[in-house]
Amino acid sequence: MFRYKDPFVQNLAEQIAALILGEAIDRESVEQALDELALANLPQLADYWRKTGCRLGIPDSAFKNSHVYYFPDQPAARVFRTSGTSGADRGAACYSPLGLKLMDLSIIENARRHLIQELDRPVIIRFVPTVSQAPEMIMAYGMELIATTFGDKARSASVITGSGVDFERLRSILDQAVSDDQPVVMLGGSFAFVNICDALEKLGWSWQLPEGSRTLDGGGFKGRSRVVRAGELRSAITKTFGIPAGRAFNVFGMTELASQLYDANSREIGPLDERPKSNLPFLQARVRDSYMLAYRDRGEGLVEIMDSCIIDRPHRVLTGDLGLASEDGVAIIGRVERGQARGCSLSLESIKF
């Protein structure tokens, strides 16, 4: 077993950080080192891979059954928990200080490339609670980190209170941004955007936000009473805020992951207008055949994500989501239903973590 302060672990973290920053680091050597760490610190993994016949990602359900964490000699610096919308139990993901530092770096660099881009200190409005309100919610943590890193410090804010959305504060911030011609970036859960656009329509409020404004929604509609097509949500955003559909971005993230998958382009390839996600040197989404578990370059299957920014647990995760593979990337198109895929049942039955 590698201890937390082992030079191997410390050096691996440095290599991962360099990979995130775009330095000339061999991705395969980083993945090999992550696999070596996984096999040394999670002995069950070798048996799991033997039984599944490949280096299959561990199922996301493993995080509900137990805390998969490599370093008993290092207390976790932070623990995030799942919402529990996909099952009764709330899963947990533990981060060591090194792991949290890598996650922060991944969130910041990913947002810089895909979301913020050319903007200089935009107003960033969050439709998620603050970290102090929801300390175990990874979306709140990540979106607050983006806001504090890139946003106008005087005007950026969460508009979520204990009783819901503070619409008066939202209107005040947006009116001021329009008056000053300052771009706005709005971040939040997919369903939050739907509810907010609905509420603003009833109030009769809408804006033509300054050029360069954009939105980022995540979380999808798992466990919700209403499913909205991605194109329908983008249309509502355009109608309410004057933001073109090409600037209404979606992101896929999980409590179990340290990184997030952003839209690769504006093509709508999924049955509900989902867009393909962009792979990066430190983050890849692949689709596995639901029965044979082989990778597929085209068509539907199980989504497996390799997130090289994870150093505290296996970096290969079988998400339980259904994906559509294309030349542009993988679109996340829903959850795998019970009994739909041999791969899920096999992975769950093969081993207990």
What annotation goes with each model-predicted range?
Residues 36-81, 87-95, 103, 109-117:
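Active-site diphosphate/adenylate-binding microenvironment
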Residues 1-4, 23, 55-68, 95-100, ...:
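Short, mixed-charge, low-aromatic patches
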Residues 99-107, 135, 166:
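Phosphate/oxyanion-binding active-site loops and adjacent basic polyanion-contact surfaces
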Residues 50, 98, 239:
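Short polybasic/polar patches that bind polyanions
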Residues 1-37, 121-122, 136, 145-353:
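Active-site glycine/GP-rich loop and adjacent strand/helix microenvironment
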Residues 112-148:
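Conserved AMP-binding loop of ANL adenylate-forming enzymes
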Residues 92-101, 139-144:
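"Short basic amphipathic alpha-helical interaction patches in structured regions
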Residues 87-97, 120-131, 154-159, 295-296:
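Short acidic, glycine/Ser/Thr-rich loop/turn "cap" segments at secondary-structure junctions
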